[in-house]
Regions:
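N-terminal pre-domain/capping segments
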Residues: 1-100, 118, 125, 161, ...
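Acidic/histidine-rich catalytic cores of soluble enzymes
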Residues: 3-7, 119-201
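Active-site-proximal loop/turn and secondary-structure-junction residues that shape catalytic pockets
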Residues: 11, 36-38, 76-78, 106-109, ...
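Conserved strand-to-helix beginnings and helix N-cap segments that scaffold or border functional pockets
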Residues: 17-18, 83-86, 114, 144-145, ...
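Short Asp/Glu-rich motifs
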Residues: 43-44, 81-82, 112-113, 143-144, ...
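Intrinsic-disorder/low-complexity, polar/charged segments
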Residues: 51, 82, 109, 143-146, ...
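Active-site groove signature of glycoside hydrolases
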Residues: 93-110, 127, 132-135
């Protein structure tokens, strides 16, 4: 069985979506993940929902190459997040043919975090999108077990899952046993990374 490989935008974050799609096609990928929301002041985002010309160029590149958009990112679930403000983001994802949204846990109130995750899943469902929560060792949801617990507290939405990044999985001390018995819909895809399993000093 073969599986599609998608190029994550962070790998080539200085390239516009259209440029990145063409690079992905030339290097053998079948899909891409696009960063539509800026994450840090020093790392760009490409808000296609607010830029019709760039949206047209991106869709043209998809038609030209035959690639598809696998996911869009990056929703930081923070204390002040208004989920309804993500309507145009979700609409852009649907227009691009994306299947999932990547979200990250940056609210120290775990109950509120679970509620916002559930609300994002509900909003995304209206656009035919799923949502995956990516865990990071430096956040309040540092590992796989904690991310699965947030999903449970959110009511285990049908379109809600967890994203395992191999780098964060090993650096967080998550256990392979925690993967056992999980339905594929809960862990729909994973991120592969060639960084060292342990960080430097």
């Amino acid at each position: 069985m073969t599986r599609d490989l998608a190029l994550a935008h962070l790998t080539t974050i200085t390239l516009s979506p259209a440029e990145m799609i063409r690079v992905a096609a030339r290097t053998g990928f079948q899909a891409v993940g696009l960063r539509l929301i800026q994450v840090t002041p020093t790392s760009p985002g490409y808000p296609l929902m607010d830029d019709p010309a760039s949206m047209r160029a991106t869709r043209s590149a998809l038609r030209e190459t035959g690639l598809r958009v696998h996911d869009i990112e990056f929703v930081k679930i923070e204390p002040g997040l208004d989920v309804s403000s993500l309507e145009s983001f979700c609409a852009a994802g649907a227009a691009l043919g994306a299947s999932r949204i990547i979200a990250a846990p940056y609210d120290p109130d775990l109950g509120r975090l679970a509620d916002r995750y559930a609300a994002l899943c509900a909003l995304a469902a209206g656009y035919g999108l799923g949502v995956v929560l990516e865990f990071f060792p430096w956040t309040v949801v540092p590992g796989l077990a904690e991310a699965l617990e947030i999903r449970r507290r959110a009511g285990a939405p049908a379109n809600g899952g967890v994203l395992v990044d191999a780098l964060h999985f090993y650096r967080s001390g998550s256990r392979l046993a925690d993967l056992d018995g999980q339905d594929a819909s809960v862990l729909p895809f994973l991120h592969l990374c060639d960084a060292p399993a342990r960080g430097g000093d």
